[in-house]
Amino acid sequence: MSQIPETSDIVLIGAGIMSATLGTVLKELEPSLSVTMFETLHDCGQESSQAWNNAGTGHAANCELNYTPQRSDGSVDISKALEVNTEFDISRQLWAHLVGKGAIPDPRAFLHPCPHMSFVWGDDNVAFLRQRHREMAAHHCYHGMEFSEDPAQIAAWAPLIIEGREPGQPIAATRIISGADVDYGALTHLLVKQLQAQSGFSVHYKHRVVALARGADGRWLVTVENVTTYERSTTSARFVFAGAGGGSLDILQKSGIPEGNGYAGFPVSGIWLRCDVDDISARHHAKVYGKAAHGSPPMSVPHLDTRIIGGKRSLLFGPYAGFSSKFLKHGSYADLLRSIEPGNILPMLAVARDDWQLSEYLIGQVLQTSEHQFAALQGFFPRAQREDWQRAVAGQRVQIIKPDPQHTGVLEFGTELLASADKSFVALLGASPGASTAAFIAMEVLQKCFDDRLTPDAWLGRLKQMIPTYGIDLKKDADACRDSRAKTAKVLQLDFV
């Protein structure tokens, strides 16, 4: 293992997809930067980025119904879906750039074309999906989205969700073939590998950040401990990024920046059902998202997915949520307790008071028997057999609890970047939509903390080589959107319609 440097321009805490993406972007923009990455575990991409710890969806908001709520007048609000949809374009452009220059030799090592579908049953849900399709298909970002209420057509798209279904049941589906299944664990390894081939980059596994303090010169003193030998080292850094998933809140609290006052975390665990039977997985080629039960939170949307991991095809169904006090899958049951501070007790109590729907949902999920869980799968796949499926534990998701002047504290289901006033420290909190928007989040870090470098005589030219549509609103510019998707689809070997 390489020696820990005494000084570094950039320190990245956590070796998941977020840190790997930001490190890649920064080294592309300024190759002379020294970048040091610290990771508690033995390898990169072992927490939420690891393939079976997430759904692997290229979240382009094609099929996730929670991004398109229905208004009281029956119309559908697609504004959030459009945001997520075009954020994924940033990831596609970054990946295509890296493939084009040979930094990632083969896109199929982490990315596979996979249609994205929405599937519902019941008259009200069919009416909702019909209206959703009407509004989305009219927008250029969703060009080519198909809709059907015909069981034969839906069976041609995804036979397992139709076979054995009650005849005459009202059903509907949408499909868009330009979707993807992404192995974010493999992608993280590819990004870190190409970083390790560059001078000025080092990654240090089995090193936990135990202290974070300001030096007299204004730089950050990052103290890490070797989890095997307990030896401690300190690196002086100009800029620190906490991209440690559920561990980012702890790093934020260690930093002491006032911008983090009052923030807390609410951990949610997840369970999948997984099928590795070749004869079954070979007959399902789609990510099929359903409609969550009324009143349930966004992370509860059920889906039946194709997964391709290490060349092996499998199916995944879930998630079933639960409660665990851990902030990381490999964390401690004391994580939640340790995160409580005088400044965040009131926001946490306010959320406990106001968010009864979430509490009821989680209690219901925890109390579910395996029979209840399997019945939910059979709602999607009527002929599913219990012996073909096994339980798999997903990664931990830590939702944001933040101070709020009106309610004291509120629970948020997105992601948020919290930066220090002098732009030398930033922490990424939250869980959704997550890995799919890692490149977009990297752009947000640049705009928050390196805006002085985003000029024509500094980074702007290189940034536009990486992200050709930087500065263009793809939600409004149909030609730029279509051109970008055609080009990235060709490089990344994705379907384009």
Curated annotation (Swiss-Prot):
Origin: domain of life: Bacteria
Species in which this protein is naturally found: Rhodopseudomonas palustris (strain TIE-1)
Gene Ontology molecular function terms on file: 2-hydroxyglutarate dehydrogenase activity; L-malate dehydrogenase (quinone) activity
Catalytic activity: (S)-malate + a quinone = a quinol + oxaloacetate
Family: Belongs to the MQO family.
Name recorded for this polypeptide: Probable malate:quinone oxidoreductase
UniProtKB keywords: FAD, Flavoprotein, Oxidoreductase, Tricarboxylic acid cycle
InterPro entries from the UniProt entry: FAD/NAD-bd_sf, MQO
Enzyme Commission number, as recorded: 1.1.5.4
Stored Pfam families: Mqo
UniProt cross-references to SUPFAM superfamilies, sorted A to Z: FAD/NAD(P)-binding domain (SSF51905)
